[in-house]
């Protein structure tokens, strides 16, 4: 094992802000990180739905970093879109905005796993809890390291995502200028791995996993069908070839969809409530897919 594996990060109590931009028609946001000495820069998708940093093989060259260490362990992992990857665990120095972190583990895949529309990205930056890590527990995940080793001013991160310019990911602090009103806090259990929180959608109680790597709102087909049938102006349909349920509505109409967290209502605006069109109708940005997460989690 690497002699510094699991060693503490240099204590800085720091904050950093990473500029992000959207790709693939506002379906994903990517930002820059650096790995190695000297640093090798790359763009990754920061994902609260996975725990590990996974990098494509053409983005990182171990031979070009004098701080790189190839561990003995292999890894296998998969994502909700069906992508499956495998490769080798490495340990090296990271930089996230202004924060420098030493000896963090990541996976270097054997083959490129990113799709054509993701070609600007070099990998996945997992931000969830370590209980869903696909690495041995001796390897600290990014979030685990930043929290346990007191690298940040506060153990928080903040996404601000929008079309075009102005999107950011802040580590270690909260920028109140990025939003209106007060913050709403909800409890999550780290043992679940995902950021799972109780919520309501149009008044009905649901359990949700907040996932920055997912473009639309996803629930089970039965629950989405129930939601659509209770929402004025929207009718339910299913694609039998994919077993996906969805809602359709006239594009000159704006259905009301409200998500409630911690007693605070968040009403989807006109741009948020629809994700494209089909046969002259607008598609509701809530779809039904079974077997994505357990316990009917949205």
For each predicted feature, which ranges?
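Structural motif
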Residues: 35-37, 96, 196, 201-202, ...
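Edge beta-strands of extracellular beta-sandwich domains
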Residues: 268-272
């Amino acid at each position: 094992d690497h002699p510094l594996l699991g060693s503490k990060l240099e204590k800085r109590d720091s904050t950093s802000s990473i500029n992000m931009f959207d790709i693939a028609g506002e379906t994903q946001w990517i930002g820059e990180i650096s790995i190695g000495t000297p640093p090798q820069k790359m763009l990754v998708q920061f994902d609260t739905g996975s725990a590990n940093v996974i990098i494509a093989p053409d983005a990182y060259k171990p031979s070009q970093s004098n701080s790189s260490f190839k561990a003995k362990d292999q890894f296998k992992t998969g994502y909700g879109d069906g992508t499956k990857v495998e490769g080798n665990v490495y340990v090296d120095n990271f930089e996230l905005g202004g924060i420098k972190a030493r000896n963090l583990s990541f996976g270097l895949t054997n083959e490129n796993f990113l799709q054509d529309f993701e070609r600007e990205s070099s990998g996945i930056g997992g931000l969830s809890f370590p209980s869903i890590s696909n690495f041995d527990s001796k390897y600290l995940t990014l979030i685990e390291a930043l929290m346990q080793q007191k690298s940040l001013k506060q153990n928080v991160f903040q996404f601000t995502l929008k079309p075009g310019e102005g999107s950011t990911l802040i580590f270690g602090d909260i920028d109140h200028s990025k939003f209106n009103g007060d913050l709403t806090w909800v409890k999550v259990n780290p043992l679940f791995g995902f950021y799972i929180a109780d919520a309501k959608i149009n008044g009905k109680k649901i359990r949700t996993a907040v996932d920055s790597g997912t473009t639309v709102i996803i629930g089970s087909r039965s629950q989405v069908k129930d939601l659509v049938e209770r929402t004025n102006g929207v009718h339910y349909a299913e694609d039998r070839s994919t077993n996906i349920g969805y809602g359709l509505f006239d594009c000159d109409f704006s259905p009301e969809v409200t998500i409630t967290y911690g007693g605070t209502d968040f009403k989807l605006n006109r741009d948020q409530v629809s994700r494209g069109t089909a046969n002259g109708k607008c598609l509701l940005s809530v779809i039904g897919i079974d077997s994505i997460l357990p316990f009917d989690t949205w």
